[in-house]
Amino acid sequence: MPQSNNEQTEVTQENPSFITEKAAFTAVGLRWEGSFAEAGAGSIRAMHQRFLVQYETIPNRVPSPYFYGISYHAAPGAAGFVHYAVVEVSEVSAIPDGMLSLEVPSLTYARCDHRKGQSIDRSYQNIGAWIDAQGYRLADTELTHFELYPLVQDPYSGDPEFTIMMPVEKA
């Protein structure tokens, strides 16, 4: 049956995924803690913007075209989460004012790319389904996931590109 112009068809979105290892690393950047509603209202994007303004002040940056957006569970019973905007460093010799250093353990990750024009929710649904289909589950860690953002991308872009990395273990 033909569809009218008012009906929308569901577009298939593919996010090819794979398993990768990431060695432990040290990072320096900014910390944010808040609710999912605050994050949805843009407070993380504002923090990312502040981070990018201060990026050049971080010594010993490991060369990369990306910065990390790392999310952790908040304290038990809390209504939100903790998010860091950081860059990997070769060593911590000095920490710029208002920033901190963070140690990220060596973990196994499921990885996929979210591209412009895709639904962010669908990208996360796709990688979650892929993890299950491969016989993995989310790892029991405080770190829930991280995203790799291009340094040249505007944090306020309504159509961002980034890489999703979710810690996993065999089910």
Where are these regions (language model features)?
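A solvent-exposed interaction/effector surface
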Residues: 1-171
